[in-house]
């Protein structure tokens, strides 16, 4: 048991240390980069140290708990704590943000603000995953929006203002529903707001009210995850954002929606979840097929990868809605797995664009000969994305399959039908992945493009790719590494579920 405020330091350190960036020399790009990477590495070491020494894997209860009164007027507390569900996403956040900062090395325009915004996102993401208070959860959720909007609108492509505006309209619209759900749950049945997760978990609501709260939270998560039809901001955003921002979006931002769906909707509103889950299961199944089919029709490389992300999110939805130990484990494993694979694919797409200055697949071809290292890495991560055995994507999707097959909630025929449609989705994934590889790397197309230089991956880019590839293969070979972090938390969620 540690009484040292580890989580408060871990949450506040990136944004606090990041604010000193503005005191660094305006033209000292190298100093700014090393300073930011130093903060990210130190934060990752802090997270690893705190978790290794003070986190008990066999304890499903909240650990490293902190509770400080913040605003007396409406009994608002700074409540932090972690359990098996939040430890994986926090470690993923630390790892991907550090590599995204290294990936942002070529950014020289307003680099002080750029790196500060990345560190502000870092704090917001870790704050959200370790929050134990509904209002604090909402504040951390909102803390993400402004940095992402600015990163998009200032360092994006030609249509950056359009995609940034679309992003803020969608996510801010979803946040209104999130706030209504938070305030509704906090103020129900009491003169004083009850915002902490522990009390809310034991609170029972009238059925109609619980469905209303569930729906409010669901809309917010459906935008962030995204769930169709609220997904259209994602391809536009990924198509225009700088690839280091894409790494954070695909690696962490989308996972916040899935985390919220488990942490609040599943844990705090179980009756409504059992009503909504069959419908969400259908949506998740349709999403896998729809996004995989749409991805195949995309000319833009980054948009094709973005639609593949939407397709993979369908597996997370199905895992969460199976309401089984296996399915939920598979969903969390897919959250971690896709965090690595999605970030790597966007990074490689961005570095390829830096060299050839072409985004449309039908204009590419023959890149494998001048750039064999990029070709090798891109092929490896495409294989991971299409769930090649031995890679993390395969294990995650397989566990989700077992989860839906063994679910006692559904009858045999719906289970067979959903499994069959999911299998079609898995067949469609290699079609768009391998087609993307063929269009980019094979053939003998000559590039008549001014200012294009065919330089293969440098040491920095190779280092980032290998750093992401190692956990992808590691989890694929030994998934218990992630599943053991969950410990008894999944059983704990489901046991509360069936008791109530």
UniProtKB/Swiss-Prot annotation:
Coiled coil: none annotated. Pfam families: Proton_antipo_M. The chain crosses the membrane at residues 4-24, 37-57, 87-107, 113-130, 134-154, 167-187, 208-228, 242-262, 272-292, 305-325, 330-350, 386-406, 416-436, 462-482. Its EC number is 7.1.1.-. It catalyses: a plastoquinone + NADH + (n+1) H(+)(in) = a plastoquinol + NAD(+) + n H(+)(out); a plastoquinone + NADPH + (n+1) H(+)(in) = a plastoquinol + NADP(+) + n H(+)(out). It is found in: Plastid, Chloroplast thylakoid membrane. GO terms for molecular function: NADH dehydrogenase (ubiquinone) activity; ubiquinone binding. It is a multi-pass membrane protein. This is NAD(P)H-quinone oxidoreductase chain 4, chloroplastic. It comes from Ceratophyllum demersum.
């Amino acid at each position: 048991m540690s009484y040292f405020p580890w989580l408060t330091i871990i949450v506040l350190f990136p944004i606090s240390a990041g604010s000193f960036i503005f005191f660094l020399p305006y033209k000292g790009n190298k100093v700014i980069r090393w300073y930011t990477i130093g903060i990210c590495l130190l934060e990752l070491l802090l997270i690893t140290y705190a978790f290794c020494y003070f986190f008990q894997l066999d304890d499903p209860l909240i650990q490293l708990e902190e509770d400080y009164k913040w605003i007396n007027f409406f009994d608002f507390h700074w409540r932090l704590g972690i359990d098996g569900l939040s430890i994986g996403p926090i470690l993923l956040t630390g790892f991907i943000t550090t590599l995204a900062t290294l990936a942002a090395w070529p950014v020289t325009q307003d680099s002080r603000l750029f790196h500060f915004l990345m560190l502000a996102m870092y704090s917001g993401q870790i704050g959200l995953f370790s929050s134990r208070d509904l209002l604090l959860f909402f504040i951390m959720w909102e803390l993400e929006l402004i940095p992402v909007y600015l990163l998009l609108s200032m360092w994006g492509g030609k249509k950056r203002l359009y995609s940034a505006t679309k992003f803020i309209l969608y996510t801010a619209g979803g946040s209104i529903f999130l706030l209504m759900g938070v305030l509704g749950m906090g103020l129900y049945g009491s003169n004083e707001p009850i915002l902490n997760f522990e009390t809310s978990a034991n609170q029972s609501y009238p059925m109609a009210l619980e469905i209303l709260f569930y729906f409010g939270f669901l809309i917010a998560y459906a935008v962030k995850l995204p769930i169709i039809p609220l997904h259209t901001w994602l391809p536009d955003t990924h198509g225009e954002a700088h690839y280091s921002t894409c790494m954070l979006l695909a690696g962490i931002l989308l996972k916040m929606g899935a985390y919220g769906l488990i942490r609040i909707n599943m844990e705090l509103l179980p009756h409504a979840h059992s009503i909504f889950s069959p419908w969400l299961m259908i949506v998740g199944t349709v999403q896998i097929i729809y996004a995989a089919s749409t991805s195949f029709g995309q000319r833009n490389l980054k948009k094709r990868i973005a639609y593949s992300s939407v397709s993979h999110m369908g597996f997370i939805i199905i895992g969460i809605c199976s309401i089984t130990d296996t399915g939920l484990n598979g969903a969390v494993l897919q959250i971690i797995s896709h965090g690595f694979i999605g970030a790597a694919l966007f990074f490689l797409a961005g570095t390829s664009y830096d060299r050839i200055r072409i985004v449309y697949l039908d204009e590419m071809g023959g890149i494998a000969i001048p750039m064999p290292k990029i070709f090798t890495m891109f092929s490896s991560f495409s294989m991971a994305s299409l769930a090649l055995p031995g890679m993390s994507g395969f294990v995650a999707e397989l566990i989700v399959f077992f989860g839906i097959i063994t679910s006692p909630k559904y009858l045999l025929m719906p289970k067979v039908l959903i499994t069959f449609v999911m299998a079609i989705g898995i067949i469609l994934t290699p079609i768009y992945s391998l087609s993307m590889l063929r269009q980019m790397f094979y053939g003998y197309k000559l590039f008549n493009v001014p200012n294009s230089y065919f330089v293969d991956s440098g040491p920095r880019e190779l280092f980032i790719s290998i750093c992401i590839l190692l956990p992808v293969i590691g989890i694929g070979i030994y998934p218990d590494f992630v599943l053991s972090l969950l410990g008894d938390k999944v059983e704990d969620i489901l046991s509360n579920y069936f008791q109530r």
